């Protein structure tokens, strides 16, 4: 069974508790369970992970090559300044789609810039947890072509 790796970055372990008016009430565990079921219904496996540590995220991106058909990445605040994560994305051959629960472009100005998005297949922002499902569909469609 093909695998899609889902990587969530810093503070996403606080989903459901942290600013629910922005990020929603669904917990990270709820999100992971939802994505696992979503993938299985389409004949795929979702490998869901979360870390508050940049090095873990980099290691997982590297690990995705050879193990996964694609990566869904929510780098959290690392989006705005982690050239190390950007370089990790650029170093692998599997497609990466960046996802953000909130519309980062409608928030504080420092959130408007993504150093990681230019090396991804695409970016989905502001659609809540459905954004992850849309990213998965995009990766699965890419597999069919």
UniProtKB/Swiss-Prot annotation:
The keyword Amino-acid biosynthesis applies. Keywords: Amino-acid biosynthesis, Aromatic amino acid biosynthesis, Lyase. Pathway: Metabolic intermediate biosynthesis; chorismate biosynthesis; chorismate from D-erythrose 4-phosphate and phosphoenolpyruvate: step 3/7. Its EC number is 4.2.1.10. It catalyses: 3-dehydroquinate = 3-dehydroshikimate + H2O. Substrate binds at residues 74, 80, 87, 101-102, 111. GO terms for biological process: amino acid biosynthetic process; aromatic amino acid family biosynthetic process; chorismate biosynthetic process; quinate catabolic process. The record marks 18 as: Transition state stabilizer. The active site is at residues 23, 100. InterPro entries: DHquinase_II (IPR001874), DHquinase_II_CS (IPR018509), DHquinase_II_sf (IPR036441). It is an enzyme of class 4 (lyase). The keyword ATP-binding does not apply. One of its GO terms (molecular function) is 3-dehydroquinate dehydratase activity. Disulfide bonds: none annotated. Catalyzes a trans-dehydration via an enolate intermediate. HAMAP family: AroQ (MF_00169). Belongs to the type-II 3-dehydroquinase family. Homododecamer. This is 3-dehydroquinate dehydratase. The gene is aroQ.
């Amino acid at each position: 069974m093909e695998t899609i790796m889902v990587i969530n970055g810093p503070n996403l372990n606080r989903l459901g508790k942290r600013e629910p008016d922005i990020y929603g009430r669904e917990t990270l565990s709820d999100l992971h369970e939802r994505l696992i079921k979503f993938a299985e219904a389409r004949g795929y496996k979702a490998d869901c992970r979360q870390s508050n540590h940049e090095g873990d995220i980099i290691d997982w991106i590297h690990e995705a090559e050879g193990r996964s058909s694609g990566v869904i990445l929510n780098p959290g605040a690392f989006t705005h300044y982690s050239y190390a994560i950007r370089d990790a994305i650029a170093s692998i051959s599997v497609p990466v789609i960046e996802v953000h629960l909130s519309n980062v472009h409608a928030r504080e100005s420092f959130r408007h810039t993504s150093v990681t998005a230019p090396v991804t297949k695409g970016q989905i922002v502001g659609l809540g947890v459905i954004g992850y499902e849309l990213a998965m569909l995009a990766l699965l469609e890419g597999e069919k072509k």
